[in-house]
Amino acid sequence: MSKIVYKFGGTSLATAENICLVCDIICKDKPSFVVVSAIAGVTDLLVDFCSSSLREREEVLRKIEGKHEEIVKNLAIPFPVSTWTSRLLPYLQHLEISDLDFARILSLGEDISASLVRAVCSTRGWDLGFLEARSVILTDDSYRRASPNLDLMKAHWHQLELNQPSYIIQGFIGSNGLGETVLLGRGGSDYSATLIAELARATEVRIYTDVNGIYTMDPKVISDAQRIPELSFEEMQNLASFGAKVLYPPMLFPCMRAGIPIFVTSTFDPEKGGTWVYAVDKSVSYEPRIKALSLSQYQSFCSVDYTVLGCGGLEEILGILESHGIDPELMIAQNNVVGFVMDDDIISQEAQEHLVDVLSLSSVTRLHHSVALITMIGDNLSSPKVVSTITEKLRGFQGPVFCFCQSSMALSFVVASELAEGIIEELHNDYVKQKAIVAT
């Protein structure tokens, strides 16, 4: 019998009404495995709890309890919210939060949501087995962004006795070699789902979210963006890596390894279809076309001329970035100049300015704030003609282009933030909607 993994995100569980929709789907389809995120907004509240003063933590705890109690009240089922949230009480006495404490605290969101969904399904006559994520997702010792130990997970999986037809599992969390709780990183519930799929040799992963699949561009930016019926793993990887928020980038690797297709659809309107993501033979030559666009605003661009450092300059700069804990969104090196993009939401401007001070000790460094990273995803985009065509189009916007970076499936460039949406709209109208060849 084929196995299917369903994953429901936080927006799918945000209200009692939404949870009822989720449980309708589960009880009707009876998927082999169900992975759930925390209820929308709960993880953010738990992060706030960790960063707050002792006095403020009491207020955050009340908000966390209140959010869950309102949902339980509207579901009209018995559910012990206070029993779950009592796990936070010891942290009202101790200000310092270690990385292990952080992982334990944030895991509460998924622990509650999995238990709640299971309880609702039970009232409808479908008893889900509980598969504890900490006993399945086995990782290294990083508490906040752990890496799965796949060999260990596979060995352990074969020892499990899975006798029930359907199981629910918490997303986002796992455990290390000492059995301590760890996190897979924000967005990690998608990763949990595909890891379970790989272990179970599933035939499909179905991601339920608040949109009907993957779009040619964020509909909040381009109102007439179109749903994409299908994408290759590589195309989706590029989209996810360069700003598309629908899927968490690492979650693709288990499905790529095992050849398991992913279907992205809406919890609220599943009959309208979605987007398939699967392996596609890219050895065939395709004409240069843009399939989708992504936009990352609130970025900064740094260029470093390391000519004076000689042949070891790039390695030295990379070492400085690593020592400052900076993982650029995009990096390109050419002619003794390296340029990289930093996300202002992740790396504060204060941290960026400090980095520039360090880099300037041995190189000529320039930092540009208020820029945007635009990426085009498609086929055969690495030809000089494509870059020439796009460069010519950008000249019409009379603003600087800070850098280009290209591969056969992705072409990225950095522009001033105020120009970005106009550029995106023109590229979408001229190439994506028309399915036009970029360069002839």
From Swiss-Prot:
Q: What class of enzyme is it?
A: transferase
Report a single Gene Ontology molecular function: aspartate kinase activity
Tell me the CDD domains matching this sequence.
AAK_AK-HSDH-like (cd04243)
Catalyses which reaction? Answer: L-aspartate + ATP = 4-phospho-L-aspartate + ADP
Could you say which EC number(s) this protein's record lists?
2.7.2.4
One GO BP annotation is: threonine biosynthetic process
Annotated pathway: Amino-acid biosynthesis; L-lysine biosynthesis via DAP pathway; (S)-tetrahydrodipicolinate from L-aspartate: step 1/4; Amino-acid biosynthesis; L-methionine biosynthesis via de novo pathway; L-homoserine from L-aspartate: step 1/3; Amino-acid biosynthesis; L-threonine biosynthesis; L-threonine from L-aspartate: step 1/5
| UniProt keywords, alphabetically | Amino-acid biosynthesis, ATP-binding, Diaminopimelate biosynthesis, Kinase, Lysine biosynthesis, Nucleotide-binding, Transferase
Q: Name one GO cellular component term.
A: cytosol
Name the protein family: Belongs to the aspartokinase family.
Instruction: Please state what the protein is called.
Output: Aspartokinase
Instruction: Provide the species name.
Output: Chlamydia pneumoniae
Q: Gene that codes for this?
A: lysC
